[in-house]
Amino acid sequence: MNDQVIIFDTTLRDGEQALAASLTVKEKLQIAYALERLGVDVIEAGFPISSPGDFESVQTIAKHIKDSRICALSRAVAKDIDAAAEALKVADQFRIHTFISTSTVHVQDKLRRSYDDVVEMAVKAVKHARNYTDDVEFSCEDAGRTPIDNLCRMVEAAINAGAKTINIPDTVGYTVPNEFGGIIKTLFDRVPNIDQAIISVHCHDDLGMSVANSIAAVQAGARQIEGTINGIGERAGNCSLEEIAMIIKTRQELLGVHTGLDHKEIHRTSKLVSQLCHMPIQDNKAIVGANAFSHSSGIHQDGMLKNKNTYEIMTPESIGLKNKALNLTSRSGRAAVKSHMDAMGYKDNEYNLDSLYEDFLKLADRKGQVFDYDLEALMHFANLRDEDDFYKLNYLSVQSGSVMSTTSIKLQCGDEEKCEAAVGNGPVDALYQCIYRLTGYEIALDKFDLTAKGEGEDGLGQADIIANYKGRKYHGTGVSTDIVEASGQALLHVINSIQRADTIAEMKQQKFATV
């Protein structure tokens, strides 16, 4: 049996379902680039039939990602499969992933069909997908609660129809490791054509068993694991791929398998997903939490000083967690900035050097020394901006008193610069009143967070907001050494997204009115 475990990432599809506001195409592409650097074998980029935005995201990622196979999800319905194929056709290598429910409760109460009908639908879907590609994956939704005889029958039929990967999901996170591993073992024992497909698993974390179940499945013969970065996903989330990666690496002698991942990209990828998805990582999260490599007990510290192996089973460096790199200053040129970006593994097409260098100089003038983590924060924020942003903050002045604050701003509104001042309950409230008045948009804020993106008093701060406008949620991000400015950038990020959507809607309305 092959000893490589294929890593299938569904952060951009299953993971995104947990977010309050959907990721933009640009944000999804940033994450896809990071997954490609990490060495993920398959990236499930989205569900094309679900929305025009998802179709565009899959198509864009399929066009730009070269080293990972791009996958799109579809129900066992011809029009879904057609949409997936259309979005994926620009990819160098792609996979169509189709699925249908197999558990008794799903078949009877959701599909309201006989099991014979469901098997027939699955076979037709796989055969239809094979018209577009040889790489077809079929999933038995809620396999963890499917009667084993029915599951064996479905798997055999899907393989006969041409599926090259069979995915066994624990959709509601119901099983425990011995039980789930037993399901996989039974499939290998009872399905006669099982050797013609790779067995995959997709475990949810409702009972906190997703990672353990996935490892049990590998021990029983599964050779693909599906999951997400940081374990994000619906309800309690998905299997954490960074945990899977380091379990397989750390316990390779026991498990006898390996992955093709570049483990030193784990920390950076985790931070990016956390930042763009607006989902903080808990401090005690395995592998990537802030405390993952901390030792506060005196006994532990004494042991670590004598021999790190006493309490450390893996090193921070093994996941790419480094101390400060050589710093840059305002005297550093473009070549120095590019050299640092190259050393961190970023490709030229992942950022605009001129824009990054301009932001770098502003930051260097403010804080003197700029480190690699600062450059990354600047790059990610710059990638969220659009050159055609209608509103841009040109000037900000804040006066804070013991009770109220006054904020004055100059805001670029298209070709015109406008000025406004307001008094508020704190500088951010006053700034937001200025922006609301000048733009005409009044936004309902559902969530407001400030986080540090660097170290020390002069480190970058990131503001993240979830805003509600006309029933739709938007995510805005801002980065600056000044948290008030970062807060303003986050609100303008949202308002520019709304303004852009309103403009497109108005253009479509005018187009149809003239037809």
Curated annotation (Swiss-Prot):
Ranges for domain Pyruvate carboxyltransferase: 5-267
Compartment annotation: Cytoplasm
InterPro entries, sorted: 2-IPM_HCS-like, 2-isopropylmalate_synth_dimer, AIPM/Hcit_synth_CS, Aldolase_TIM, LeuA/HCS_post-cat, LeuA_allosteric_dom_sf, LeuA_bact_synth, PYR_CT
Enzyme class: transferase
Keywords of the record: Amino-acid biosynthesis, Branched-chain amino acid biosynthesis, Cytoplasm, Leucine biosynthesis, Manganese, Metal-binding, Transferase
Record-linked Pfam families: HCS_D2, HMGL-like, LeuA_dimer
Positions that bind Mn(2+): 14, 202, 204, 238
EC nos: 2.3.3.13
Keyword Cytoplasm: yes
Protein name: 2-isopropylmalate synthase
Species per Swiss-Prot/TrEMBL record: Vibrio atlanticus (strain LGP32)
The organism's taxonomic lineage, starting at the top: Bacteria, Pseudomonadati, Pseudomonadota, Gammaproteobacteria, Vibrionales
